[in-house]
Amino acid sequence: MRKLIQSGFTLIELVVVIVILGILAAVAIPQFTDLSASARDAVGQGACGALQSTAVLLYASNKTQTPIATIISSTTVTGGTFNAGTCAATTFTPTGGSAVSCQTIPTAICS
């Protein structure tokens, strides 16, 4: 007579695997949350760089100071909005994020 061979995992083995997966998920999820926050900050910094580049390009083509409102309206950035400000204090608010302060645009090219 042949002996019956059972194969498969025991309940304890399955519980151990589920516990390990739970621990890994608890460690990994906060890291992904931090990545999305830093990505929003990077979008803000990129938008500020685009604003400064637009100011320089407008000055180079017009050879005169350009109002900050014109610089903002000439800058095309997706993923947030510029807040009306001055050459020294313009901010960009990424969608779902907090405002990022843009570096000062020199008053020689911005009015």
What function would you assign to each model-found segment?
Residues A26, D34-A37, S53-V56, A60:
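Regular, well-ordered alpha-helical segments
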Residues S53-S111:
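Periplasmic/extracellular, small/polar-rich flexible segments of pilin-like filament-forming proteins
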Residues T33-G49:
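Aliphatic-rich helix starts adjacent to a transmembrane/signal segment
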Residues L4-S7, S38, A60, S74:
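Surface-exposed loop/turn and secondary-structure junction residues enriched for glycine/proline
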Residues M1-G8, V19, Q45, L51, ...:
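Short, contiguous, well-ordered secondary-structure segments
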Residues K3-F32:
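N-terminal single-pass transmembrane signal-anchor helix
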Residues M1-F9, T95, I109-S111:
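A contiguous, well-structured "functional interface" segment within a domain
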